[in-house]
């Protein structure tokens, strides 16, 4: 399948204008947080959505969808490969206050990583949690580490050992709220919702019997 980067870039710029960098929910009333991640076997992708109790950090439920992915991985355009899988799940699953997405939100060359793409197109509050930096420079912001791009703080950095997590706005959440929620949910290498989604998707992908 041919991938048109120019048209994809234009769509990203248009959608980036629709991102809301403010809380569309009450941060004090959060009860359940979902995590989204994708694993692959060949050209088949498995998207998993894991719901975690925000107070106890215990897993509540896990959901998944399996489908062939016709679009190849293109740096900066991950959403066009993985977002359709995520959106299929989001339409089916209820009972969460926001979603953590494995990938970037606003920390993207055109301001629309997969977390923002998924958030804007679904209307669901999302947070980007990425393991690698796409844009910006790391600086000190008081007692925190932050990522600054074009003169603006676009992410906070959370460290767990040698692992860095870049926490950014996806959609319908403020950066401060995104940081506080991810920090609370991260007791090991990854925030619990994404860690569970990663485990589930990897396990299912390994078990697939492909022709």
UniProtKB/Swiss-Prot annotation:
GO BP, sorted A to Z: DNA repair
GO annotations of cellular component type: cytoplasm
Reaction(s) catalysed (UniProt annotation): Endonucleolytic cleavage at apurinic or apyrimidinic sites to products with a 5'-phosphate
Broad class of where this protein is predominantly found: cytoplasm
Catalytic activity, EC: 3.1.21.7
UniProtKB keywords: Cytoplasm, DNA damage, DNA repair, Endonuclease, Hydrolase, Magnesium, Metal-binding, Nuclease
Top EC group: hydrolase
Signal peptide start-end: none
Amino acids binding Mg(2+): 37, 102
Site residues, Interaction with target DNA: 73
UniProt subcellular location: Cytoplasm
Superkingdom per UniProt: Archaea
Gene Ontology MF, one: deoxyribonuclease V activity
Essential cofactor(s): Mg(2+)
Protein task: DNA repair enzyme involved in the repair of deaminated bases. Selectively cleaves double-stranded DNA at the second phosphodiester bond 3' to a deoxyinosine leaving behind the intact lesion on the nicked DNA.
Family (UniProt): Belongs to the endonuclease V family.
Protein name according to UniProt: Endonuclease V
Origin species: Ignicoccus hospitalis (strain KIN4/I / DSM 18386 / JCM 14125)
């Amino acid at each position: 399948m041919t991938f048109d980067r120019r048209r994809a870039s234009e769509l990203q710029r248009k959608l980036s204008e629709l991102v809301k960098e403010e809380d569309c929910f009450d941060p004090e009333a959060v009860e359940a947080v979902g995590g989204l991640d994708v694993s692959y076997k060949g050209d088949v992708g498995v998207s998993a959505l894991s719901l975690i109790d925000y107070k106890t950090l215990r897993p509540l439920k896990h959901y998944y969808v399996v489908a062939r992915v016709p679009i190849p991985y293109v740096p900066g355009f991950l959403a066009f490969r993985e977002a359709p899988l995520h959106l299929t799940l989001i339409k089916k699953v209820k009972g969460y206050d926001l979603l953590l997405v494995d990938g970037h939100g606003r920390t993207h060359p055109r301001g629309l990583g997969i977390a923002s793409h998924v958030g804007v197109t679904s209307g669901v509050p999302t947070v980007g949690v990425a393991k690698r930096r796409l844009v910006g420079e790391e600086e000190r912001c008081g007692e925190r580490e932050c990522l600054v791009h074009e003169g603006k703080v676009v992410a906070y950095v959370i460290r767990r050992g040698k692992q860095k997590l870049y926490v950014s706005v996806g959609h319908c959440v403020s950066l401060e709220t995104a940081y506080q929620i991810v920090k609370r949910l991260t007791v090991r290498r990854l925030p619990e919702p994404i860690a569970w989604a990663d485990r589930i998707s990897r396990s299912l992908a390994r078990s697939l019997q492909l022709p």
